[in-house]
Regions:
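A structural signal for isolated positions on well-ordered beta-strands in alpha/beta enzyme cores
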Residues: 55, 96, 121-123
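Short, surface-exposed "cap/lid" segments of acyl-processing enzymes
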Residues: 1-63
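Active-site nucleophile elbow and catalytic-triad environment of alpha/beta-hydrolase enzymes
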Residues: 219-223
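Alpha/beta-hydrolase-fold enzymes
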Residues: 88, 92, 107-211
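Conserved catalytic-core motifs of eukaryotic protein kinase domains, centered on the activation segment
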Residues: 66-68, 135
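Alpha/beta-hydrolase active-site loop
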Residues: 68-89
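Gly/Ala-rich beta-loop-alpha elbow adjacent to hydrolase catalytic centers
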Residues: 98-107
Length: 223
């Protein structure tokens, strides 16, 4: 751990192990346990049983003293630092990056800046690449009415409530629809447990470092 950066190592659960380790890079607003919710409901568990050596770059809530962390900090510092730690711990030079959501954005930027780096394979999922095709997100953050400087200068770090509200505006009926699905499966104990796990994660959003939020808004959403 180093400030908001957390690095975990999961041991393989197979006799034959792939040589190249996998580094999972989480979204900066999401807790990493979404990929390891419970036995039988875990992407990490699946990879371990397949024989992969799995590491995860996860995030702790940034403190008030970390409000200065910006886009470059994540791309040029945290990701290469974790890759170096994975290399040292595994004894391997090559690394596979598998990145989720904004973790994929950061990893894509790292890859573009380090084309001859140690990443052998790169996979990203639910990752926005074309920022001009962000639809409602682009409308919500339009510079004509969204003053990101005022927001960050006033609050420092951006609280999770702001992040959750933005996603709720994108899908205003999603919570209601989720409750309907829960009701339809009320007598299925496993379905209820799985729903509660996912719902807990969905409400366990992280705040974002102020300068990082300012950077992503201006350099990605606006530029």
């Amino acid at each position: 751990a180093r400030g908001t950066m957390l690095l975990y190592h999961y041991r393989p659960l197979a006799d034959e192990i792939f040589r190249v380790p996998i580094l999972l890079v989480m979204a900066t607003s999401s807790r990493g346990y979404i990929l390891d919710l419970a036995p039988g409901q875990s992407f990490v568990e699946y990879l371990l049983k397949c024989g992969y050596d799995v590491y995860m770059l996860d995030w702790a809530p940034p403190t008030a003293a970390e409000k200065h962390l910006n886009l470059a900090t994540y791309v040029d510092d945290f990701i290469p630092d974790c890759i170096s730690k994975v290399q040292a711990d595994s004894g391997e030079t090559d690394v596979t990056l598998a990145a989720y959501c904004m973790g994929g954005v950061l990893s894509t930027m790292y890859m573009a800046l380090n084309p001859d780096g140690p990443v052998k394979n790169f996979v990203c999922f639910t990752t926005p690449i074309n920022w001009h095709g962000m639809g409602l997100f682009s409308s919500f953050s339009d510079k004509r009415w969204f003053d990101v400087d005022k927001l960050v200068d006033s609050l420092g770090n951006v609280p999770p409530e702001v992040i959750v509200a933005s996603f709720d505006m994108l899908r205003p009926a999603s919570r209601f629809a989720g409750n309907i699905r829960l009701w339809d499966n009320m007598w299925n104990d496993e379905a209820v447990k799985a729903y509660r796990r996912l719902e807990r994660w969905g409400n366990d959003t992280l705040p974002l470092a102020g300068e990082y939020f300012r950077d992503t808004t201006k350099k990605l959403m606006w530029d």
